[in-house]
Amino acid sequence: MTAPRLTLPSPAKLNLMLHILGRREDGYHELQTLFQFLDYGDEITFAVRDDGVIRLHTEFDGVPHDSNLIVRAAKKLQEQSACSLGIDIWIDKILPMGGGIGGGSSNAATTLLGLNHLWRLGWDEDRLAALGLTLGADVPVFVRGHAAFAEGVGEKLTPVEPAEPWYVVLVPQVSVSTAEIFSDPLLTRNTPPIKVRPVPEGNSRNDCLPVVSRRYPEVRNALNLLGNFTEAKLTGTGSCVFGGFPSKAEADKVSALLTETLTGFVAKGSNVSMLHRKLQSLL
């Protein structure tokens, strides 16, 4: 009998805005941010094993097998659910590492949701999101799969419905260290909190942008080039830069001009992640 298999998408996210309100006693930063998904991402294939072994068959340069967030997510879920089954995992990786579009966090969330389904654990979203938070602050939004206004370190989520434009996303060929940006002495850390709900339109500033563009000329260049066509923004701590367009045709036209010299892609913004749409279709 062939082992049960499942292939799931692992979508990218954008931070449509990112405000840093202050530094907490535990060293983390208090944030307010707006998450939206892209219909673009990695693809992860899972095959159940009956011997309890967890094996990721795709190698990542410079990332030991057991340190990979996918493997850590699988092991934590296996331990906390006391599941005796194992899993073989393959990933078709297109999202950049250190790009600010949530590649690792999204992979971890897809793993938690995929294994919950294949191992028939019956965990609810709250329980999976709580486990996800122990792996990273951005994992819960991918577990929940809905565009959200996030507070705290990014884990307190309120569902929102921003517009869903087409985006041009540019991928400067640098990996930005989040820790480096958050420890920069020039980082703005005192933005007043947004208290109005829903969050007013037009709050699109990313407090990390001045520091990132100062440290990384490649990011600055991408912002300047995309900024000739639309408001160019930084997602997360970068390196990826994005801008919205009303139609795919317009986004494609700008992308064609810019990707002669830069790496990038076009994707539709989505308030319900393509991972959750796929999981719904399995029910």
From Swiss-Prot:
ATP binds at residues 96-106. It comes from Pseudomonas fluorescens (strain Pf0-1). Belongs to the GHMP kinase family. IspE subfamily. It catalyses: 4-CDP-2-C-methyl-D-erythritol + ATP = 4-CDP-2-C-methyl-D-erythritol 2-phosphate + ADP + H(+). The active site is at residues 13, 138. Keywords: ATP-binding, Isoprene biosynthesis, Kinase, Nucleotide-binding, Transferase. Pfam families: GHMP_kinases_C, GHMP_kinases_N. It is an enzyme of class 2 (transferase). Pathway: Isoprenoid biosynthesis; isopentenyl diphosphate biosynthesis via DXP pathway; isopentenyl diphosphate from 1-deoxy-D-xylulose 5-phosphate: step 3/6. Disulfide bonds: none annotated. This is 4-diphosphocytidyl-2-C-methyl-D-erythritol kinase. GO terms for molecular function: 4-(cytidine 5'-diphospho)-2-C-methyl-D-erythritol kinase activity; ATP binding. Catalyzes the phosphorylation of the position 2 hydroxy group of 4-diphosphocytidyl-2C-methyl-D-erythritol. PANTHER family: 4-DIPHOSPHOCYTIDYL-2-C-METHYL-D-ERYTHRITOL KINASE, CHLOROPLASTIC (PTHR43527:SF2). Its EC number is 2.7.1.148. It comes from the Bacteria. GO terms for biological process: isopentenyl diphosphate biosynthetic process, methylerythritol 4-phosphate pathway; terpenoid biosynthetic process.
